[in-house]
Amino acid sequence: MWGAGLQLVMHTSTLAAAIEEIVIETTRTNNNYNITDSSLTKFTEPLQDTPQSIITLSEQLLDDRGAMSLNDALRNVPGITLGAGEFTWQGNNPTIRGFNSRNDMFLDGMRDYGSYARDPFNLEAVEVLQGPSSMVFGRGSTGGVINQASKQPQADIIRKLNINVGSANTVRVNADFNQPLPIVGSAFRLNLVNHRAEMPARDGAKTELYGVAPSLALGLGDATKLTLSFMKQQSDSRPDYGLPWVAGVPAPVPRETYYGFEDDYIKTDADIGNIKLDHSFNADLTLNAQLRYAQYARSSRITEPLVNGVVTANTPVQTVIINRNVFSGESTEDMLQGQVNLLANFATGSVNHAVVTGVEIAQESSSPTMMIAVGVPATTLLAPANIPFSATRMQVRARADTNSDSLAAFVLDTIKFGSSWQLLVGMRWDHFATHYTGNRFDQIGNTAGTEKIERTDIETNYRTALVYKPVEQGAFYLGWGTSFNPSAEGLSFIANARNFGISNAFLEPEQNSSVELGSKWEVFNGRLRLEAALFEIVKSNARVPDPTTPGFNALAGKQTVNGVSLNLAGSLAPDISISGGYAYLDSEEAKTGPTLDNQGRPLLNVAKNTFSFWLNYTGIDAVELGTGARFVGERLARNVSPILSAPEYWSFDAMAKYNISDNLIVKMNVTNFTDELYFDQLHPFHVVPGAGLSAVFALNLSY
C-alpha cells in the first residue's frame, strides 16, 4: 500500500493485447476515489447497482491519507469504531453499524481469522460491506464485513520503492515490483514492507513488522488464469493497553502515560498461501476456484492498568494506586479453506439472469494457552514506574483445542426485468461443526473445569432485494438479509477472558436480520458517486446472563440499530477528488436479562454520530494539497452500572505534495494537526488514547 513514501515506478507499454489485459486486471484500482466494481466474484453487478451499502477505500485514497495500517484505513469509514485489545484477542477489532466485527475479516473473499494487526502493504483496496451478509460470507457479519483486496500480477512492468521517515521514530520502507515473464501471459509480483514506529504522544508503545508477498500469474489475457500467491507478515511489538478508567471516565493523566512494563510484547506471524483458478468457458459462463492454507501464530505478555479499590470523583488522584494486570499467552490457528463459484448469465424469455452458485469447505483449528501473572508490583496513577517485568510466578488459567469443520452451499440470482427493474434473491446453507477440549485452572493451579464439547449448527440464511433504475445513472433499492452468530464463531467456547467461563457453549446461534432502503447516483458524468441508506438491524435473541443458571447465558435479549448512512466518493472536478460520509446509529439494548440494568441504553462502542471526509486538490501547477477531518461521538465502554464513557472528538489531517519534475515528488502527511486529545480504542477495563500530532515525510521517484 502506497502511504507516504519514496516510490520508484516504471511502466512500459507492451503489445495491444497486453494493454487490453492491463485494463481488465486493474479495474478495481481506479486512479481516484470512485471504485466502480467489487473485487468479489460473488457480486455480478457494478457497485452502483448492488443493493447494499459498500464503501471501498481505494489505494489512491489510502495513499493520500498516508495510511500505514488497516486501522488507519478503517478510521476513514463512518459507522466504524475501534475496540481495544484484550487478553484473548489482539489486532484489528472494529465495530460496524453497532456490532463487533473482529471475526468478520476477509482476504480476497476468504476468511482471514488471525488475531494480528494487518498491514496494507499488499492491498489495492479495502472493501467495507455493511449489514448482515451470512448469505455471502457464512457465519458472522451482523454489522458487516471487511474484505481486503490483494494486489495481483499484471502484464505491465512496475518498479516502486517507498521510504517514509517521520515523527515518533517512524521508518517505513515498502516496495512493489511486477515483471512480465518470458512465457506469454505470465507475470511475477513482489510486495515487501519493513515498518518501525512508536505511537505519537504515547510513551512505551511501538510497532515493528515486516512483510513479504510474492505472487505469480499464468494465463493473463487467456480464458484460463492461474494465480499462486503467498503472504507473510511478522511483527514484534510492544502493546498499548492505554489508561485505566477512573470514576467512569478515562484517567485524568497526560496521554503519554504508559503503565506497561518496558519488556511487554506481542509477537505475531501470519503465513497465507493461496491458489486461485479463473476459467471462462465463454462470455456467459465463468468458474472461480480458490484453495488456501493459512497459519497464524501469536505470543504475548500484556499489561492492563486497573484501579486498586474504589475510586470516586472526589478521590485525590495522587493517592490512586494502579494494579498491573498481566496476561500472557500463546496460540496457533490453522485454516484450510476451499471455494468454487460458478457465474452464469442467461435468459428465460425476456428476463435476464446473472446467477452465482458455489460451495465452500473449511477446516479450522485453534490451540491457545492462557496465563496470568501472580505477584506483580503495583504502581501509581500519576507516576507509573518504567521497569522490566517481574512477578512471583506465572499461572496457567486455560488450555484449549478447538477444531471446526464447515461446509456451505449457496445460490444468488440477479433477475433483470428490462433496463429498469432488478430482483435479487439468494440463499445459503451452512453446516458448522465444532469439537472443543478445554482445561481451566483457578489462580492457585487447581483444576476449575475440564470440558469436551461437540456442537453442530446448521443454518440457512437469505438475501433478497428489489432495485429500480429510473435512469442509467441512478438506482433505488429495498433489501433484506439475515445472518447468524454461533457460539464458537471465534474458534473457542471461552466467552469470558476474566474467569475463562464457557457461558455460551450450549447455546443455539444468535439470529440477525436487516432491512435497508437506499439510493445510489452517479453525477458529473460518472465522476462522483452519491449514496444514501436507511436501515435497521435486529439481533432477535442476543446472549444475556441466565438468571436460573449462574455462569451461563441465555438467548433472551434483543439488540437493535436504526441508522442512516450518507457517502460520496469520486471527483467534484478534474482537479478535486473527495471521499467522505456520515453515519447516524441509534443503537439500543432493547431487551436484557433481569440481572442487568442496561435495557434501553446504547450498545457498546457505538457512536450515535460519526463523520469523515477527505478533499484532494491538484489544480495548482506542480502542487497537490489534501485535507480531511473525522468526528466520532460519545461511546460507552460499559453500559451497565457503573457506566464508562469516552467523549466525542474531532481530528484533522493534511497532506502536501510537490512535483519537482515528472520523475521526482516530495510529500508530507500531517495527522491530528490540532494535537487533539481523544480516545481511539475502548474496552470495559481500559481505554487507549489516539495518536498525537505527527508528520511523515516522503520522496517519490518515478521513471
PLM segments and residue spans:
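Structural signature of Gram-negative outer-membrane beta-barrels, strongest in the C-terminal barrel
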Residues: A217-G221, E333, N352-A354, E360-E364, ...
